[in-house]
């Protein structure tokens, strides 16, 4: 199975390797365990392993993990996503799970990967539970905030605008990560940003997610779903694609990166599953 996917393992780091897929070459970090946590990023250039590290480092060694950098992010090479849709991205993730012979897993996703998660759950590999961290909803992605604003979100956006997106994000990484990890995160993101700046006009960084992608989603009632979100978004998620008869909302935090501020709660939940 692994040879079919053209896995290339690094001699120096047997847990990190690249997988050639139809959407591009993906950098993967993998550790075997009695149960496997699959972690998928939202938007942005941050490498997925480091993004979820505040959770991973709180888990016992018996729990394994799989993190995947999508094309043009983290450690994955540059590859235009022109002509590639969400279904193609889902299929690439599914092929990696199959290639590693993962028969069941816990899925932990942030932001935009929530939409990917709902499609991935329909694939024939058992998902024990979905942990969705402020997953993207159709309501928020296509909302007209001039008609129905979130005062709390508007306040956050004002704060980001005042200090600048990079300074805002750097403030969060500084209080979350040890100095060496934070330095590596910014080194990788800046390197990737420079590579992307050199691409020709029309280069597409990420897959487009359409309203039709949301319309085709369905969530089975037998899958336990845990949604971590800020308190002001509670109603949005109760009315969302992520709500079934087994959904539980866990409220907390005051920014979008709850995998950092709420990592203790998330790790405790994973240990219990």
Protein language model regions, located:
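N-terminal cap/lid segment of alpha/beta-hydrolase-fold proteins
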Residues: 7-25
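Conserved serine/cysteine hydrolase catalytic core
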Residues: 188-245, 250
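Conserved catalytic-core motifs of eukaryotic protein kinase domains, centered on the activation segment
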Residues: 49-51, 76-81, 142-143
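Active-site loop/oxyanion-hole signature of alpha/beta-hydrolase fold enzymes
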Residues: 67-106
């Amino acid at each position: 199975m692994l040879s079919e996917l053209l896995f290339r393992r690094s001699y120096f780091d047997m847990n990190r390797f690249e997988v050639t897929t139809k959407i591009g070459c993906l950098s993967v970090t993998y550790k075997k365990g009695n149960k496997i946590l699959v972690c998928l990023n939202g938007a942005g250039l941050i490498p997925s392993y480091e993004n979820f590290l505040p959770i991973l480092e709180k888990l016992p060694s018996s729990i394994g993990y799989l993190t995947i950098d999508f094309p043009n992010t983290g450690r994955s090479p540059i590859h235009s996503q022109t002509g590639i849709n969400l279904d193609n991205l889902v299929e690439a993730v599914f092929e990696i799970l199959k290639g590693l012979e993962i028969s069941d897993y816990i899925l932990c996703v942030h932001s935009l990967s929530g939409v990917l998660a709902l499609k991935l759950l329909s694939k024939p590999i058992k998902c024990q539970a979905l942990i969705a961290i402020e997953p993207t909803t159709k309501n928020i992605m296509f909302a007209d905030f001039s008609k129905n604003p979130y005062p709390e979100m508007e306040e956050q956006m004002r704060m980001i605008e005042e200090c600048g997106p990079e300074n805002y994000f750097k403030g969060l990484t500084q209080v979350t990560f040890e100095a060496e990890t934070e330095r590596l995160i910014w080194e990788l993101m800046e390197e990737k940003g420079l590579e992307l700046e050199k691409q020709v006009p029309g280069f597409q960084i990420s897959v487009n997610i359409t309203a039709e992608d949301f319309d085709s989603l369905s969530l089975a009632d037998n899958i336990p779903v845990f949604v971590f979100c800020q308190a002001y978004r509670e109603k949005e998620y109760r009315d969302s694609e992520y709500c079934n008869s087994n959904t539980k909302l866990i409220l907390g935090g005051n920014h979008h990166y709850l995998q950092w501020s709420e990592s203790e709660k998330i790790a405790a939940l994973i240990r219990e599953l």
